[in-house]
Design a protein with these regions (language model features):
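Domain-level signal for soluble alpha/beta catalytic cores
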Residues: 3-293
Length: 293
């Protein structure tokens, strides 16, 4: 009988460890107190970035050990290296900058999130995105029963952030048209996927609050600056964005999506049923599976 080599064994293992599992989770966890303290100390200049990373490493190791103990088959870093679920990913691109907010932004049921103001200063490009190294750390913790999952904001989320009512003018100054920006988002995501796939990622999750925002008719208009037919066309644009990135990804990369209505200090960003987006989101988006709230 022919012996199975290591590459073949890895393919067999990956085939049996594809998300979603019967019992699963989204991937973001509440930050431990020691991590919150370390991040605050770093922002105050009391510790170095390397010292912060040491605390992050310890917290991630403890989290993964607990996840395995509970019998889950997917492991993540809990997003412990991020300030937010989505903006840190954007900050990893050239052409995107951020600064500490003064008044807060993104209102969650009456509370303004005190997260960095994020803005575009040039055309986006990517090389050596920091999330790739973040993934490698978790990848090294895989065993025969677990597979590492990487979460990132969806292409639609990236596009929507910079084509919303507040930032669209700046985006058009840089790109000229929304179509040109959309093409660059597709290209940039393709390059990121190429990098993280080469690092061994086979389970990728698109976190997507765009659809969660669009379920609320009034909020949809406020966020996008569009209404009526223009808003319906916008929904088709973000659907096409996600689908194009999925289409161009490697065939054996599992891409799932997580749709929610936002969460900050246990408050919500949006509310409403899926009816207004269901046909597009569930009928035409070509992801492998949905994590829904």
């Amino acid at each position: 009988m022919r012996e199975i080599n290591s590459q073949e064994m890895e393919k067999i293992r990956m085939k049996n460890l594809t998300t979603p599992f019967r019992y699963d989770y989204v991937g973001s966890f509440l930050r431990p107190e020691k991590l919150k303290k370390a991040r605050a100390d770093f922002e105050a200049g009391k510790i170095t970035r390397e010292q912060l990373k040491e605390v992050e490493d310890v917290c991630i190791l403890e989290l993964v050990a607990k996840i395995k103990e509970l019998g889950y088959h997917v492991i993540t870093d809990g997003e412990f290296r991020r300030a937010t679920w989505h903006l840190d990913f954007m900050w990893g691109f050239d052409g995107i900058e951020h600064k500490k907010t003064v008044d807060g932004n993104t209102t969650f049921d009456g509370e303004a999130a005190m997260i960095d103001d994020t803005f575009m200063v040039g055309k986006i490009s990517i090389k050596n995105h920091p999330f790739v190294d973040h993934f490698k750390f978790v990848k090294a913790l895989e065993d025969e029963n677990t597979i590492a999952k990487q979460t990132v904001p969806s292409p639609a989320q990236f596009y929507a952030y910079f084509t919303g009512a507040e930032l669209l003018d700046t985006t058009l100054e840089i790109y000229g048209t929304e179509e040109a920006f959309a093409e660059d988002v597709i290209r940039a995501y393709g390059e990121f996927i190429e990098e993280i796939y080469a690092a061994g990622c086979r389970n990728l999750q698109f976190d997507d609050c765009v659809w969660g925002g669009l379920v609320n008719p009034k909020l949809a208009v406020a966020l996008t600056g569009r209404r009526g037919e223009a808003l319906e066309e916008y929904k088709k644009v973000i659907l096409a964005l996600n689908n194009k990135v999925v289409e161009e990804a490697p065939a054996d990369l599992i891409i799932n999506t997580h749709v929610c209505r936002g969460n900050y200090h246990s408050t919500f960003f949006s509310s409403g049923a899926y009816d207004g987006v269901a046909d597009l989101l569930f009928g035409e988006e070509n992801v492998n599976a949905y994590y829904l709230e």
